[in-house]
């Protein structure tokens, strides 16, 4: 059963027909907006009002750009994609755990308010279906905005056609967003995050003296109920037990707010899994199960009926439903989970893992220091990402004997398994750095690294190049060689140099046209080819002279030498500019001189906390601060022109 919830969640194919009604409503609203371009609609005291359109205020520090040069314009679609993938509608990605707020999404809100909600949800659904977003928070936040924006009393009709059209648009937008919940919120963690964002948006978008909205109207209740009722019983049991609570929310909270009632569905009464599902719903609310009906005495049945759903009791259970409950694997899993909460016996825990396919999250915390428990978790087909994440823990408890080490080496160097698991090379490089250092960043966990595993992680890094698809672009990769590049990347065991050389090797191996240069206050061409290993590259760079950092040099060098590149990637630690020409100006001059008007530049400052080189109005510039597992996918999306 654990296989149903593998580490990588497959998304379904996007069905555009599901958004057809919203598309038609949007088109009608935009036609009306074109006729009344001097007004806009807002919510005042819970009602829609027409107000004169205001010129957008120029933000503090913004000035009109008269510098000239070629600028690659940013469309509304690009801004939406940037927000969904980067977590920002500007040309920047910040490796940070900070929570997204309504202030981060003002441009997205403006696009929706202008009647383009269909485009926003279409982009969201497509990116989600293709698994193009490396993180879920911006995706879920956008879905919550679409589900809660401009909440008003939809029962009141006015004599103004435009207000009525806007009201229809908002209602269709809310309905379409709620319909997407099962596809976007694939785990309870996502669902809890969505609900939390909805509550935040409801509170922060109250206008004037509007009465506070709980956010739990009929549509919201039905959507949350549907998330639970459409799961198979075995998958629902796994979800309820593996993810009992997150983000300050629990399944019990959602059930008490959404009031899902299985008997509201006409088909439920005749469903074979009716009793099984009613038991799971009880577990979600009460945290326990009642004895299965086939095993109850008459007295026990009478006691249970006192607290059971009265609607359910009106319809007798069929023989098939009683048999299904009695033999239920889903209920067996929940019972095993409940029994293990205070279990101390390793033998009992191990037997439960083998019988029910339990995963780490099901087990009591005290058992996670057991060698036998980890041996069993590994042996019952541990998913690749879970195996990589737990290498250190399994080494500490002594669970990795020679046979299991050989198994790990085989899996890490199996290109087909790496392909199926979609493990990016950088994830393996990072895992190697974590494992090889023999200690954790938090707590007192230390271990003696197994050299075979270290070597396999590096070998897997090269094998996993298949998971970094080529873009067909011409690259100039510029590596800062200043001494500070040996320091660690923010929130990572990799040094800035290791991260830069790792990313560079992926491009060198997978792309047809790549040139590497080293820069500080001067520029040096590098002899790297796809045959070089990461150790060779690091040793070579370590022997170069270094000075101050001039991030404009690579573009200036390419301009002066009439070289043709589609993409410049600047790898540095913290200093982003110390030269005569700003990178912002250097790329514009390069575009003008080369005729490659959509040439792109990425400045990756891996230790910086907050900086901005990119012009947010230029779709060909991207800032990245910090470095994490999301960066490679973000770079690919940017280079291929998708954000």
UniProtKB/Swiss-Prot annotation:
Coiled-coil residue windows: none
Name of the protein in its database record: RNA-binding protein RO60
Entries under PROSITE patterns matching the protein: TROVE
GO CC annotations on file: cytoplasm; ribonucleoprotein complex
Domain of life: Eukaryota
VWFA-like domain: annotated span: 465-643
One Pfam family named in its UniProt record: vWA_Ro60
Record GO terms (molecular function): metal ion binding; RNA binding
Chain ranges of the TROVE domain: 63-473
Gene: rop-1
Species name: Caenorhabditis elegans
Record remark: domains: The horseshoe-shaped TROVE domain is built with 7 helical HEAT-like repeats, and is closed by the VWFA-like domain giving rise to a ring-shaped monomer. Single-stranded RNA is bound in the positively charged central cavity.
């Amino acid at each position: 059963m654990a296989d149903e919830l593998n580490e990588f969640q497959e998304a379904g194919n996007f069905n555009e027909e599901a958004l057809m009604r919203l598309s038609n409503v949007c088109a009608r609203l935009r036609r009306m907006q074109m006729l009344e371009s001097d007004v806009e609609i807002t919510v005042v005291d819970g009602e829609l009002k027409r107000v004169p359109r205001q010129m957008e205020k120029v933000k503090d520090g913004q000035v009109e750009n008269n510098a000239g040069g070629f600028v690659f314009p940013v469309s509304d679609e690009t801004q939406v994609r940037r927000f969904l993938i980067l977590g920002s509608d500007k040309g920047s990605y910040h490796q940070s755990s900070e929570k997204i707020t309504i202030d981060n999404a003002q441009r997205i809100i403006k696009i929706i308010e202008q009647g383009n909600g269909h485009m926003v949800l279409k982009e969201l659904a497509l990116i989600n279906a293709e698994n193009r977003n490396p993180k879920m928070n911006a995706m879920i936040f956008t879905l919550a905005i679409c589900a809660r924006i401009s909440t008003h009393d939809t029962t009141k009709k006015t004599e103004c056609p435009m207000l009525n059209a806007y009201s229809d648009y908002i209602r269709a937008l809310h309905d379409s967003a709620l319909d997407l919940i099962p596809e976007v919120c694939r785990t309870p963690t996502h669902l809890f995050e969505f609900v939390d964002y909805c509550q935040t948006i409801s509170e922060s978008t109250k206008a004037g003296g509007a009465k506070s909205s709980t956010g739990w109207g009929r549509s919201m209740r039905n959507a949350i109920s549907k998330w639970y009722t459409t799961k198979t019983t075995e998958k629902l049991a796994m979800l309820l037990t593996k993810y009992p609570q997150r983000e300050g929310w629990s399944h019990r909270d959602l059930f008490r707010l959404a009031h899902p009632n299985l008997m509201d569905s006409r088909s439920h009464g005749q469903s074979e899994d009716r009793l099984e599902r009613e038991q799971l719903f009880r577990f979600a609310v009460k945290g326990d199960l009642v004895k299965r009906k086939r095993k109850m005495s008459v007295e026990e049945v009478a006691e249970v009926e006192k607290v059971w759903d009265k609607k359910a009791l009106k319809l007798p259970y069929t023989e098939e439903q009683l048999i299904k409950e009695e033999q239920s694997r889903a209920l067996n899993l929940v019972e095993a989970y409940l029994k293990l909460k205070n279990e101390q016996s390793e033998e009992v825990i191990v037997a439960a893992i083998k019988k029910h396919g339990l995963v780490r999250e099901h087990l009591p915390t005290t058992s996670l220091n057991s060698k036998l428990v980890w041996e069993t978790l590994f042996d019952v087909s541990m998913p690749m990402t879970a195996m990589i994440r737990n290498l250190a823990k399994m080494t500490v408890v002594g669970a990795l004997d020679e046979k299991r080490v050989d198994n790990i080496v085989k899996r890490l160097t199996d290109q087909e398994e790496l392909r199926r698991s979609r493990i990016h090379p950088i994830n393996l490089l990072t895992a190697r750095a974590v494992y090889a250092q023999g200690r954790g960043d938090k707590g007192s966990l230390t271990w003696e690294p197994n050299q075979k595993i270290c070597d396999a992680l590096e070998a897997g890094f090269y094998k996993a190049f298949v998971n970094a698809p080529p873009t067909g672009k011409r690259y100039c990769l510029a590596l800062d060689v200043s001494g500070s590049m040996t320091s660690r990347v923010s929130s990572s065991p990799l040094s800035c140099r290791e991260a830069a050389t790792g990313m560079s090797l992926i491009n060198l191996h997978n792309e047809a046209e790549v040139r590497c240069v080293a820069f500080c206050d001067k520029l040096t061409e590098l002899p790297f080819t796809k045959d070089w290993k990461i150790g060779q590259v690091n040793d070579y760079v370590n022997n170069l002279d270094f000075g101050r950092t001039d991030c404009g040099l690579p573009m200036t060098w390419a301009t002066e030498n009439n070289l043709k590149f589609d993409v410049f990637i600047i790898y540095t630690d913290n200093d982003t500019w110390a030269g005569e020409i700003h990178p912002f100006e250097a790329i514009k001059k390069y575009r003008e001189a080369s005729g490659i008007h959509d040439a792109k530049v990425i400045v990756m400052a891996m230790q910086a906390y907050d900086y901005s080189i990119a012009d947010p109005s230029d779709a060909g510039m991207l800032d990245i601060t910090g470095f994490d597992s999301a960066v490679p996918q973000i770079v690919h999306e940017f280079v291929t022109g998708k954000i």
